[in-house]
Amino acid sequence: MLENLATEERNEKTIDLDTLSPKEILAVMNEEDLTVPIAIKKVLPQIELIVSGVISCFQKGGRLIYLGAGTSGRLGVLDAAECVPTFGVSKEQVIGLIAGGEKAFVAAIEGAEDSKILGENDLKQIKLTANDFVIGIAASGRTPYVIGALDYAKSVGAKTGAISCNANAKISAHADIAVEVVTGAEILTGSTRLKAGTAQKLVLNMISTASMVGIGKVYKNLMVDVLPTNKKLEERSKRIIMEATEADYETANKFYEAAEKHVKVAIVMILTNSTKEIALEKLSEAKGFVRNTIQK
């Protein structure tokens, strides 16, 4: 029942929220938000297990699939979308599914989250395989849409994870790895878009970023597979080449163009004094890791 969930409890610090000034509201919100990273720190070992599993799936050609309803679903869609320009992956490698489909991203779809079959069908629609990793996201930890999806994922042999914001969450029993970030009562009772949503976003950031590092999408702390989809990212790409190689702007730009705007390839060309074709071959042998490529 909802009344037994910590995320549905009333926050004693904000019982009289409607009497507070804007300054006081912001102060108490900030104070409550500071508790989120502390809660996440307690479950880092579980997050690490998910990351290791995602890396393994990626190495087998599998995908990462986020799945949730409402705010939880939107956060998954957001993180999946950001992986494309940040890490240069295809939009099929990291997928975000939300109960009710794309329309639900901007408007609530009545009853969508209450259907287990809908969660199962959404995974069937993308032809889920045993090489994929499915992460169900639900602040309450009890969303039927997510539970249905996790059960189906396990039935086809896919790895599964669950992210919730309550202890002993129902969805935890339906996943291989459970991450329960206990964020407690919200300043606005039951509004899990607040601390719970913040916690979910931070955990998703960790999972996608650490997993991408694990498959060679990063050199040092640079986004070497960035997809230059606009002028800002084109300039960032050249700066990344400069940082990685200590080349000047003119040289970085020259190799950027010679590498057909592939930052990673340009870096290897400069650091190993090789042609684009040889750089691509070296990177392939090193499974895309720049550090391993240039150390050979």
Swiss-Prot record:
Lineage, broadest ranks: Bacteria, Bacillati, Bacillota, Bacilli, Bacillales
One GO-annotated biological process of the protein: N-acetylmuramic acid catabolic process
Catalytic activity: N-acetyl-D-muramate 6-phosphate + H2O = N-acetyl-D-glucosamine 6-phosphate + (R)-lactate
Primary role: Specifically catalyzes the cleavage of the D-lactyl ether substituent of MurNAc 6-phosphate, producing GlcNAc 6-phosphate and D-lactate.
Protein name per its UniProtKB record: N-acetylmuramic acid 6-phosphate etherase
Organism annotation: Listeria monocytogenes serotype 4b (strain CLIP80459)
Record keyword tRNA processing present: no
InterPro entries reported for this sequence: Etherase_MurQ (IPR005488), Glucokinase_regulatory_CS (IPR005486), MURQ/GCKR (IPR040190), SIS_dom (IPR001347), SIS_dom_sf (IPR046348)
Enzyme Commission number(s) from the entry: 4.2.1.126
Catalytic machinery residues: E82 (proton donor), E113
Record-linked CDD domains: SIS_Etherase
